């Protein structure tokens, strides 16, 4: 599956499984067996003021056929901490 298609599947999967809006794609990597590992950031809690949303990063694992092979929450952080390497 081409990367652009895998990203679309990962975005839809993360949104469907969490019920939350997707904020963006943080990382992509082939998994070595023809599939993909894609990190999708979703907004778990929107900030009331400013840019301090609570973001969760989910690892979406897609098999070579594009089917869901795994789904894990990797971390949670405040948007202001994103660039700080949190």
Annotate the PLM regions.
Residues 16-17, 43-54, 83:
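Short, cysteine-centered beta-strand-loop-beta hairpins and adjacent loop/turn segments enriched
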Residues 34-42:
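A short hydrophobic beta-strand element
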Residues 50-76:
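A short, surface-exposed beta-strand/turn
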Residues 27-30, 50-52:
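Short secondary-structure boundary/capping segments within folded domains
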Residues 1-28:
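Short, non-transmembrane alpha-helical segments in secretory-pathway proteins
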């Amino acid at each position: 599956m081409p990367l652009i298609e895998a990203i679309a599947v990962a975005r839809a999967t993360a949104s469907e499984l969490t019920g939350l809006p997707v904020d963006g794609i943080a990382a992509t990597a082939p998994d070595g067996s023809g599939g993909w590992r894609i990190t999708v950031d979703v907004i778990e809690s929107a900030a009331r003021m400013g840019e301090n949303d609570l973001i969760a990063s989910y690892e979406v694992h897609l098999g070579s056929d594009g089917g869901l092979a795994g789904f894990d929450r990797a971390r949670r952080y405040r948007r202001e901490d994103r660039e700080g390497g949190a």
